[in-house]
């Protein structure tokens, strides 16, 4: 496998990306990394056989406009994506602006033939330890029922090929488990998903079941998916904060935390 790594576009610059690439190369020496960025900032990677440095003199900043990425063809982000377009790599990793990366992907890599809309996917940890793919999590504010069916097929394939799940369970995020729940779009999406022979559709799923681990792929419109993702993130932060405060509230808790 070959991966292109955008080293420059993240909030913290190239330093954490360089360290991550070094650790990844140690664990996965059979994977080739093509790291795009300013050559002088990537010298620590030069001695690693599985890593190739691709010099890129420009950077897509977090403050850049989404459409401004088209003017930065010499940036580390665009150079990494162009390698994917030319089939020189199998995938691209970037810590840069989500909006800029999504737009650049549409401009320079294009969509798979037959796919009407692209989406963003998040892999969620669950109670059971079984990861769940949630999509769309914000690429589109609105979606059609047909697009949700596309997301379901793509998510199912990802779950099979990347997460090695034999027959991934696919569910539709909705306001109730019954097939008649939701607005017109969600009811139509339910019918399309139920009739799709390319996926293992198990029905509607409510937000409270999102992290149960009972479903492998959950599809939703980008607006709802983004809210669901950020609500989950907020709940996780709250839980960690509460646990920390509880642990350090007593001397016994502090001692226990040292050995945890």
Give the residues covered by each predicted segment.
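Glycine-rich phosphate/diphosphate-binding loop of Rossmann-like nucleotide-binding domains
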Residues: 32-34, 40, 141-203, 207, ...
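Phosphate/nucleotide-donor binding subsite
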Residues: 48-89
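Short glycine-rich anion-binding loops that position phosphate/pyrophosphate groups of nucleotides
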Residues: 8-9, 58-59, 97-99, 178, ...
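Short beta-strand segments
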Residues: 6, 36, 54, 94-96, ...
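Short, conserved active-site loop motifs that form the nucleotide-linked donor/cofactor pocket
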Residues: 31, 51, 132, 199
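Glycine-rich phosphate/nucleotide-binding loop
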Residues: 106-120, 126-130, 134, 214-218, ...
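Short glycine/serine/threonine-rich phosphate/pyrophosphate-binding segments
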Residues: 12-18, 74-84, 91-105, 116-121, ...
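N-terminal phosphate-binding or glycine-rich loops at protein starts, especially the Walker A/P-loop
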Residues: 1-41
């Amino acid at each position: 496998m070959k991966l292109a790594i955008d080293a420059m576009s993240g909030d913290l610059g190239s330093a954490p990306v360089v360290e991550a690439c070094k650790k990844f190369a140690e664990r996965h020496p059979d994977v080739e990394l093509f790291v795009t960025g300013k050559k002088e900032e990537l010298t620590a990677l030069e001695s690693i056989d599985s890593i190739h440095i691709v010099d890129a003199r420009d950077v897509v900043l977090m403050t850049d406009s989404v459409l401004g990425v088209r003017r930065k063809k010499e940036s580390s982000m665009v150079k990494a994506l162009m390698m994917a377009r030319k089939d020189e790599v199998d995938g691209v990793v970037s810590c840069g602006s989500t909006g800029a990366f999504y737009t650049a992907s549409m401009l320079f890599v294009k969509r798979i033939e037959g796919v009407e809309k692209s989406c963003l996917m998040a892999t969620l940890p669950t109670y059971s330890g079984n990861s769940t793919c949630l999509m769309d999590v914000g690429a589109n504010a609105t979606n059609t029922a047909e697009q949700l069916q596309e997301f379901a097929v793509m998510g199912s394939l990802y779950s099979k090929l990347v997460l090695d799940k034999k027959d991934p369970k696919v569910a539709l995020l909705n306001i109730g488990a019954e097939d008649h729940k939701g607005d017109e779009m969600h009811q139509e999406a339910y019918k399309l998903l139920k009739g799709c022979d390319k996926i293992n559709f198990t029905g509607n799923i409510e937000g409270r079941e999102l992290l149960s681990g009972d479903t492998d792929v959950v599809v939703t419109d980008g607006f709802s998916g983004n809210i669901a993702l950020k609500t989950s993130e907020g709940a996780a932060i709250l839980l960690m904060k509460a646990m920390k405060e509880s642990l350090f509230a007593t001397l016994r808790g502090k001692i226990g935390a040292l050995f945890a």
